[in-house]
Amino acid sequence: MKIALLVSIFAGLCSALSITNEAIAADALTPLQVAYAGSMGSMMDGGVKPAIAKSLNADMQGRAQGSTGLANLIVAGSIRPDVFISVTPGPMRTVLKAEKTSNATPIARTEMVIAYSPKSQYASDLAKGGEVGAKPWWQILETPGVRFGRTDPNTDPQGLNIIFTMQLAADYYHQPDLADKILGPQINPQQIFQEPDVMARLQAGQLDASSAYKTQPGALGLPFLSLPKEINLGDASMEDTYKKVTVTLNGKTLHPAPLVFYAAVLKDAPQPELANRFLTWLQGPEAREILSRYRYDSPGDSKPLTP
């Protein structure tokens, strides 16, 4: 009895000591505030956060949201991150124009795909949607009753990019009504959700298919359909082709750009030294391995952005 009691007390002390050591270790990390495109959530939480805790002694405190919305919050002074990571040049140029940063470095690239739910009644058709002789993917998505999801083009670049992709698809497949039949109006409440909700609804079978970056569905075990380079916004050599389509939002005419991710240290970063070390780390081999693991491509010959 006494031996059992002593063993129990010893185990309790060890457990308490372990918890205390973990708390001390967490307290020893320097906080790093990173605002990043919502589509990067899985990689940032599962790959980057634990890696920089070891490599940079940093505790990444992330804010995931649409890049356009984040850029507007930064410019308004509503948030003050150390580092901002956006997808496509547009949101980063907003921050550059407001003189919140002096330059932005390309760190990765992706492309548009169509993600779909394995629980959907259209899953088997979509799995064959890119094959010769099969029913084309766009015809499947035009089927009445298909539940398609996307994000708000006013706040999230992906929501804008799926409109560009469908417009390019309309030209590529010689189907002038393709975008209207699949998306309906640009702002379609039946299709538009917050970015994390889109993937969650696919997993639950509440949506049949959705827009996505190639980096997203694989991380969640969801199948996806690859699109031709002429329409997927992922090939820098096709930029002139991409720019043949436009979208008008809030009185502004917008053009697509290749899907490159840019990182910038903000001028009023609370931890400027650590932020610059993080930016250097993002361009190194450890980050490259993590990016590749989560299906991000190299930025290739993409150039830095300056004011």
Predicted regions and their residues:
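Positively charged n-region of N-terminal signal peptides that target proteins for export
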Residues: 1-4, 211
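Bacterial N-terminal signal peptides
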Residues: 4-18
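Boundary at the C-terminal end of the N-terminal hydrophobic targeting segment
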Residues: 16, 23-26
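Exported/periplasmic ABC-transporter solute-binding proteins
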Residues: 25-57, 63, 67-77, 88-89, ...
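Short beta-strand-centered segments that line the small-molecule binding cleft or hinge
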Residues: 81-85, 92-106
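Serine endopeptidase catalytic core focused on the charge-relay Asp
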Residues: 114
